[in-house]
């Protein structure tokens, strides 16, 4: 599953503000739908992407209570510049045996060295998506 359905912080957005009317609580409904795909042989297991510690915990809790499929993995960013997985998700992943599939291991290419000294190689990701490079990883790399 890619992106939580509920309102939460994505891509480094800070200052989470909870509003009761934004509450989303369809964890069981989602797991039940995915269970049907497993029984039909269309998928073997399920994972989450860009999920928070609370969201992963909630999916695991509902799957245990309702005897529904467990979350096998979480796919979130993890690299030398973005270590947010370690602040809550790492412990849950280990204790609940829900593996990490790290994406952006080279910090969108910044750790490869190709953007060093302001270089912008033609046909690179940052050449195509100019605003994409204005994220936290880019700012942190400048300090190295």
Go through each PLM region and give its residues:
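Beta/alpha (TIM)-barrel catalytic core signal, keyed to glycine-rich beta->alpha loops juxtaposed to Asp/Glu
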Residues: 4-144
């Amino acid at each position: 599953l890619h992106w939580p359905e509920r309102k939460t912080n994505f891509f480094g957005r800070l200052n989470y503000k909870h509003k009761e009317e934004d509450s989303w609580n369809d964890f069981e409904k989602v797991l039940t739908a995915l269970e049907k795909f497993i029984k039909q042989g269309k998928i073997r297991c399920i994972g989450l992407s860009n999920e928070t510690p609370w969201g992963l915990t909630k999916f695991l809790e509902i799957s245990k209570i309702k005897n529904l499929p467990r979350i096998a993995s979480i796919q979130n960013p993890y690299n030398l510049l973005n270590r947010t997985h370690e602040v809550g998700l790492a412990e849950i992943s280990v204790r609940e045996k829900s593996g990490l599939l790290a994406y952006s291991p080279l910090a969108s290419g910044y750790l490869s060295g190709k953007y060093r000294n302001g270089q912008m190689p033609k046909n690179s990701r940052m050449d195509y998506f100019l605003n994409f490079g204005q994220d936290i990883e880019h700012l942190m790399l400048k300090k190295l």
